């Protein structure tokens, strides 16, 4: 899609945004456009943009993996201090929750994850990762920079906030269920809704996408250890071969999706690794394999989990072995399906279209990817939107989790403005409703 001329030129500065005058004044029409485009205009100011880009690059150069985001968290707190924004730290070890507004209901959350991946960056550029074997290959550095940008926009216009905005800087998204850990803290008990924005490399830079209802799969991880009896390879009759048993189980697990699930219901069972002995002429004592399973329904996820255990144990038994099946139960073993609240989605879509035009809003397809942001759906209304960062001229378009992943930083202002405009307009609409509820109770 050609994005030339897709952004509107704004001549009214951010500081002259019109005050809220009546309930729902930002719900649609010129009021919402003025808010959304004004936020974007301010975020695209050269000084503002360079500030955000500098934050993003500092984080990118110093990536930290799950629950080790100490420098990243310190940077977040330093920036919040400079903005005069209050916060709580630590939340879930390295997380930060900040707030702007009246400290009263309603409360709307904005979330950014902070952790990097254990991956060697292969992109050669001036802000390449300085940490060997670690890289921000999922855009979380960008998420943090955009949320800090939103904090600056909101702090400048906090007189517009009819309630409270909570800024959630979350650790440990990549396999650590950091969202689940953060939700244990009472500071997030009062959320009335929450938004997360994730960069996406197949949408043109600056475009926004989402969908109502189911958007991402529920997911789980599993490991299976098959215990047998080892022997010399020349005397297999003295063994209980765990490699053979594990191999049979891996093949049998693929029949869950092909023969046990409704063909109209999506599901995935993928074995990502298998390991056994280390010698060519020895049958080992044990073998191990592991992988992930996905479904677009929570019931489907539970069914697949149960069948992984049953099939693995049964196949091991056929070969006189025993299978030990583990679903990482020390932490949440299942990430729930990510379902966008339809009302929150519709509101976010209106904000996005008011900001960048209807032609630049994309219907995001359902995918089998997983996101621990889905834990927030069990707490409150939640919606995830994606922000395009694709720019083939820059080489930005490689998949998430690729060592060649690269971001077009020109999208930063759009993400910051989307966060801020969404929060202000949502609270404006629901703040008046909350006031009416309080009056009726009195």
Swiss-Prot record:
Xref: Pfam families: M20_dimer, Peptidase_M20
Gene3D superfamilies registered for this protein in UniProt: 3.30.70.360, Zn peptidases
Binding residues annotated for Mn(2+) 2, in chain numbering: 138, 140, 198
Keyword set, alphabetical order: Cobalt, Hydrolase, Manganese, Metal-binding, Signal
Any GO BP annotation: auxin metabolic process
Record's cofactor remark: Manganese and/or Cobalt or Copper. The ion enhances activity.
E.C. number: 3.5.1.-
Binding of Mn(2+) 1, residues: 138, 174, 401
Tissues and organs where the protein is expressed, per its UniProt entry: Expressed in leaves, stems, siliques, seeds and flowers. Detected in central regions of cotyledons, hypocotyl, radicle of mature embryos and seedlings, micropyle of siliques and in pollen.
GO molecular function: IAA-Leu conjugate hydrolase activity; IAA-Phe conjugate hydrolase activity; metal ion binding
Description of pH dependence: Optimum pH is 7.5.
Top enzyme category: hydrolase
Cleavable signal peptide: 1-23
GO CC terms in record: endoplasmic reticulum
Cofactors: Mn(2+); Cu(2+); Co(2+)
Job description of the protein: Hydrolyzes certain amino acid conjugates of the plant growth regulator indole-3-acetic acid (IAA), including IAA-Phe, IAA-Leu and IAA-Tyr. Can also use IAA-Ala, IAA-Gly, IAA-Met and IAA-Glu as substrates with low efficiency. No activity with IAA-Ile, IAA-1-O-beta-D-glucose or IAA-myo-inositol. Is the most efficient enzyme of the ILL family for IAA-Leu hydrolysis. Important for IAA-Leu and IAA-Phe hydrolysis in roots. May act with ILL2 to provide free IAA to germinating seedlings.
NCBIfam families: amidohydrolases
PANTHER family, sorted: IAA-AMINO ACID HYDROLASE ILR1 (PTHR11014:SF108), PEPTIDASE M20 FAMILY MEMBER (PTHR11014)
Protein name in the entry: IAA-amino acid hydrolase ILR1
Species of the source: Arabidopsis thaliana (Mouse-ear cress)
Gene that produces this protein: ILR1
């Amino acid at each position: 899609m050609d994005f030339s001329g897709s952004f509107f030129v704004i001549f009214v500065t951010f500081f002259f945004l019109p005050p809220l005058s009546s309930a729902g004044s930002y719900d649609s029409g010129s009021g919402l456009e003025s808010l959304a485009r004004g936020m974007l205009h301010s975020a695209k100011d050269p000084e503002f943009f360079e500030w955000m880009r500098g934050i993003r690059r500092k984080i990118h150069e110093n990536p930290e993996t799950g629950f080790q985001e100490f420098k990243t968290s310190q940077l977040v707190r330093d920036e919040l201090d400079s903005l005069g924004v209050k916060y709580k730290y630590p939340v879930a070890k390295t997380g930060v929750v900040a707030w702007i507004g009246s400290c009263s209901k309603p409360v709307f959350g904005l979330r950014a994850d902070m952790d990097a991946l254990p991956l060697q960056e292969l992109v050669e550029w001036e802000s390449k990762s300085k940490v060997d074997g670690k890289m921000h290959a999922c855009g979380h550095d960008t998420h943090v920079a955009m949320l800090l940008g939103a904090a600056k926009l909101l702090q400048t216009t906090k007189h517009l906030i009819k309630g409270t905005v909570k800024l959630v800087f979350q650790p440990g998204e990549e396999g650590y269920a950091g969202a689940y850990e953060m939700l244990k803290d009472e500071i997030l008990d009062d959320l009335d809704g929450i938004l997360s924005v994730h960069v996406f490399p197949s949408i043109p830079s600056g475009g926004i996408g989402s969908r109502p209802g189911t958007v991402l799969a529920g997911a789980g991880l599993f490991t299976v250890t098959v215990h047998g009896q080892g022997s010399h390879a020349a005397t297999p009759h003295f063994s209980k071969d765990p490699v053979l048993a594990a191999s049979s189980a891996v093949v049998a697990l693929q029949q869950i999706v092909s023969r046990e699930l409704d063909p109209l219901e999506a599901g995935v069972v993928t074995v990502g690794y298998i390991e056994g002995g280390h010698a060519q002429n020895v049958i080992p004592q044990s073998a191990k394999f592991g992988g992930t399973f996905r479904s677009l329904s929570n019931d489907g996820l539970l069914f697949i989990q149960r069948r992984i255990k049953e099939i693995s144990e049964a196949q091991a038994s056929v070969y006189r072995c025993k299978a030990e099946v583990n679903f990482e139960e020390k932490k949440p073993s299942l990430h729930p399906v990510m379902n966008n609240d339809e009302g929150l989605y519709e509101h976010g879509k209106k904000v996005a279209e008011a900001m960048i035009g209807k032609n630049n809003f994309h219907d995001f397809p359902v995918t089998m990817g997983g996101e621990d942001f889905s834990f927030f759906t069990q707490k409150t209304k939640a919606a995830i939107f994606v922000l395009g960062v694709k720019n083939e001229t820059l080489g930005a378009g490689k998949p998430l989790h690729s060592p060649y992943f690269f971001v077009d930083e020109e999208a930063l202002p759009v993400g910051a403005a989307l966060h801020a405009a969404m929060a202000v307009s949502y609270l404006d609409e629901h703040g008046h409703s909350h006031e009416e509820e309080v009056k009726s109770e009195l």
